[in-house]
Amino acid sequence: MASTHQDNVVFEVNAIGWAPSGTGTALSLHHEDPARLPTAAVGHGHRPSGRYVVAAGRADEEDGLCQVITPGALKPRVTYRVAGWISVASGEVAEEDGKQQRGHPIRVSIRVDDGSCVVDGGAVCPQPGRWAEIKGAFRLRENPRSAAVHVHGPPAGVDVKVMDLRIIATDRKARFRHLKDKTDKVRKRDVVLKLGGAPGASVRVVQLDNGFPLGSCINGEVIQNPAFVDFFTNHLDWAVFENELKWYWTEAQRGQLNYADADRLLDFCDRTGKPARGHCIFWAVDGDVQQWIKDIGGDRDQLMAAVQQRIRGLLGRYAGRFPHYDVNNEMLHGRFFRDRLGDDVAALMFREAAQLDPGAALFVNDYNVECGNDPNATPDKYIDLIRGLQRGGAQVGGIGLQGHVTNPVGVVICDALDKLSATDLPVWITELDVGEPDEALRADDLEVVLREAYAHPAVQGVVLWGFMQGHMWRQDAALVNADGTVNDAGQRFIELRREWTSDARGRLDGDGQFKFRGFHGTYVAQVTTAAGKMLKAFTVDKGDAPLVLDMMDI
């Protein structure tokens, strides 16, 4: 996907400027016909040149290629993209966890001030003999005295190939201008209100709710905090329970069920009128499985019985209460149940959940898919996972992108969303938080993610993974300070909500019509004539054609 604007390439690696890293590493220059190379270029207009460098004879994972970055090229507080193409020699096969997997993770690092600080610049896992586009990002806090880019990562003996590596300063303002135009097409619609016989009457249209929900996780502690409840009820639409629905919480000890905490949170959601996502039925990562489940993990029959009892117990109790469920959390990063019960158990979880609560949308949910720098969690791997579940009869109803982001780059997020949209499944950002100590930069980072999500037609909602200092899983991510004051990031969030809310006023024209363009959602219109005032509620749904409403019929 080509960018709609030209970002600033601050450093372009010279193919002959590479130096070997490691005493045994040898570099050589090569050329390949560009017509045979991939043409994708995420967020920049450059295509592969065909000129690349091979690093052979590597004796260690840290060995590879390095090149000094032009002094003064990198500035603090600027978000940089790392772009280019990386490969490994044909025939190389990686081995991970005892299973043969094609490809090796290759990492790009920015080593600052003679290596005293190493900044992650992204990673890819190319298939041998094929090129993969790197989509990393980084940001520096201070002006560096020196900086160098290093490419490394695979085991000793694996030859690394690098082509057209660039460091690009992102232009967020230009990107935001593009996204505002895109948002107008994706999230708004022309509306015509008709009231015959009353030309010149005064009209006021107010949007009550946006059709794009924004939510937050909650827990039993924060709902006792008045400042939290005030921000949540005034600025957020949905909820998700931080821990209280997870299996390790509802059944920490075998047979000792605790649904009281989840029930209290559901009561809170009912009182405040907020739907809640069901997170999660299972968790695929070994470290997030409670001990008694691990203890029976070697007994297939016992473990399968526990899995089925969990599904029946949870969904039998709460059928119809949660519009969404994350079924088996983080399957790109964990295989606890599949390794012990077979790959089909993941689809079985979906099949049985669908039978018990057919009205709920059943989600996959994982992290790093949107950031472009986790070789285990690429959009392509996520799509492969989803297709495999569907072949097994799983009724996958949605895609969850957790959104635990650092230094987000809009075009990389958009590229992931574009790829996932090919599944025709709705996408939600399910656990958004932005880690950044500087509140002004945190606000900018938050805006990057929210604008990309809101402007993309595949995304149907965003849920924050908390927002209040002292009550979040992640440090330096709050929108509201511990004393209840709203910080820069929180103000930015409120401003975006205000920007995405329509308000129109004017008069009926000579044909008795009032026209406006508004965001999808629910509205009330007040028409004032000589005979008095009329209030009418209506909904603006998605659609390309203008929505024409006769005020006497609504």
Question: What residues fall within each predicted segment?
Answer:
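Extracellular and organelle-lumenal recognition/adhesion modules and their flexible linkers in secreted
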Residues: M1-C217, V222, P226-D230, N234-H235, ...
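A short, solvent-exposed beta-strand micro-motif common in secreted/extracellular proteins
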Residues: G521-A531
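Structured interaction patches on ligand/partner-binding surfaces of diverse proteins
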Residues: N143, A531-I554
